[in-house]
């Protein structure tokens, strides 16, 4: 399935595909760029905060309507990052977001802008020193819930994985 030029339709399609209301680590940040409704989708813990802040600054400072002509023109002139792709296939967008990329949809664009701003937690999951098991995965989680979730999301890139706060 491909995206449309209508923001509300695209927003609903991606929210359903990503199951946005079912996981607290999936961020759907609605913003306005040059008077157009837009939304950023990303997984908390898998994106670099500094890069997101810089990108958001650029988005809020867009003042030329001609940059909003197409996603390609917008990307070329307004996305201050090297690793960027314009994608209109919903499955590719979902895969990108679940693998740590940031997706931007903008009203009037029939494609999303994928920004590779991913970062992975600093350590690998290790087998715990105590409670060793003979079979199965040798993963141990011990940091904050966001870090633990990022480690799990890094391995399981499935929109059916839902996480609710307890």
Language model feature labels by segment:
Residues 1-166:
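Membrane-embedded alpha-helical signal segments
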């Amino acid at each position: 399935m491909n995206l449309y030029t209508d923001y509300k339709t695209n927003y609903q399609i991606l929210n359903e595909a990503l199951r946005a209301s079912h996981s607290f680590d999936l961020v759907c940040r609605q913003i306005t760029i040059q008077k157009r409704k837009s939304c950023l989708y990303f997984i908390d813990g898998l994106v670099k905060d500094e890069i997101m802040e810089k990108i958001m600054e650029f988005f809020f400072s867009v003042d030329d309507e001609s940059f909003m002509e197409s996603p390609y023109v917008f990307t070329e002139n307004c996305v201050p990052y090297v690793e960027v792709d314009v994608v209109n296939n919903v499955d590719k967008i979902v895969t990108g977001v679940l693998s740590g990329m940031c997706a931007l949809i903008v009203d009037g664009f029939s494609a999303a802008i994928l920004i590779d701003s991913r970062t992975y937690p600093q350590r690998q999951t290790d087998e715990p020193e105590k409670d060793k098991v003979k079979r199965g995965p040798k993963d141990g989680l011990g940091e904050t819930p966001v870090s633990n979730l990022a480690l799990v999301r890094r391995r399981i890139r499935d929109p059916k994985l839902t996480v609710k706060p307890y």
